[in-house]
Amino acid sequence: MGDNKNNGDSGKLLYCSFCGKSQHEVRKLIAGPSVYVCDECVELCNDIIREEIKEISPKRDSDKLPTPHELRAHLDDYVIGQDRAKKVLSVAVYNHYKRLKNASPKDGIELGKSNILLIGPTGSGKTLLAETLARSLNVPFTMADATTLTEAGYVGEDVENIIQKLLQKCDYDVEKAQRGIVYIDEIDKISRKSDNPSITRDVSGEGVQQALLKLIEGTVAAVPPQGGRKHPQQEFLQVDTSKILFICGGAFAGLEKVIEQRAHVGSGIGFGAQVKGEKEKATISETLTQVEPGDLVKYGLIPEFIGRLPVVATLTELDEEALVQILSQPKNALTKQYSALFEMEGVELEFREDALKAIAHKAMSRKTGARGLRSIVESILLDTMYDIPSVDGVVKAVVDESVVKGESAPILIYEHNEAQAASGEQ
């Protein structure tokens, strides 16, 4: 076999047996028994094989569905606490993908969708749980904010745009998008403004719930590949939303009062009433675990919408101890992330235990939950991250309680074991 452009024996002009180009039009012409192939055709064949392998690999990976125990273990690696919610989510997600895997109904039994409603305070981990599950399953994931959604035809974002975002995440591969997870945050903000239907249109409340109904339950949504109203002439993609898992989340502030009111009905009033002491009163998190569909209706969600979210999981408010764990224990804990950033400069970053407690205490006082931790850590380390790339010889930075309280700067330790504050003071 040869790869020369000339045929020394006959002087005959040779052509690629695949594309027909002559030996003078290509860089290489590889000879076989009565056959020739050029370098361009070889490269094209390699590209085709690579694409086919890329398409087959994800399918092979997705053949094995993680069990609820495996899903829960993955959540434990990234999310602290919320044990009950993790178990509920793991089972619901497992059942959803089991339903997709065995699409043909057995004995005429068609399995319903297990869309999920997460109820819990801000910063308790609702979004992180949904994101981590999608990452664990290697499926497309997108988020939407319910407060920005409006009915079609009104100023704002159409509910169909949610599917548009999901398609963008997987390069408009409809098959992949139909296995995706959509997380809709602030779902409590689209509750009806009152129990009585209003004469005027509630385009960002009940109207959005109505618009989301079919999308969540399952419909074939026609989605333009390049966005909504701007390209009416282009061909639409057909996406079956019955295969997409929808997870809705919200803080539902005040829902505990609705639950308490329902629970106390019939418990007696006046002298016959049972009076609970301070210690007997349930916490807000404990009260929320008793939520029933009727409570959500009274809160302002329409019955049809609640019916599309059969799986309900409540998350507890994170205490100071949990926030300390969140700072240091998960695989992608904040302290580990910032340590990695400092390591890129050749500097070791150390957070002392009293510093972690002080950061958690500050987040608790701000009532931001885990969501507020990053901004606190960022503000503590800002000046140090600004200075370190320009300072030679720093091998370690230490953060203690006084740094978090703003009383001092992080301690910098140099190669010759001398230590000084990041500000340059001895």
Swiss-Prot record:
InterPro entries: AAA+_ATPase, ATP-dep_Clp_protease_ClpX, ATPase_AAA_core, Clp_ATPase_C, Clp_protease_ATP-bd_su_ClpX, ClpX_bact, P-loop_NTPase, Znf_CppX_C4. GO terms for biological process: cell division; proteolysis involved in protein catabolic process. Component of the ClpX-ClpP complex. Forms a hexameric ring that, in the presence of ATP, binds to fourteen ClpP subunits assembled into a disk-like structure with a central cavity, resembling the structure of eukaryotic proteasomes. It comes from Shewanella baltica (strain OS155 / ATCC BAA-1091). ATP-dependent specificity component of the Clp protease. It directs the protease to specific substrates. Can perform chaperone functions in the absence of ClpP. Residues 4-57 form the ClpX-type ZB domain. CDD domains: RecA-like_ClpX (cd19497). Belongs to the ClpX chaperone family. Zn(2+) binds at residues 16, 19, 38, 41. Gene3D superfamilies: 1.10.8.60, ClpX chaperone, C4-type zinc finger domain, P-loop containing nucleotide triphosphate hydrolases. NCBIfam families: clpX (TIGR00382), PRK05342.1 (NF003745). ATP binds at residues 121-128. Keywords: ATP-binding, Chaperone, Metal-binding, Nucleotide-binding, Zinc. This is ATP-dependent Clp protease ATP-binding subunit ClpX. One of its GO terms (cellular component) is HslUV protease complex. GO terms for molecular function: ATP binding; ATP hydrolysis activity; ATP-dependent protein folding chaperone; protein dimerization activity; unfolded protein binding; zinc ion binding.
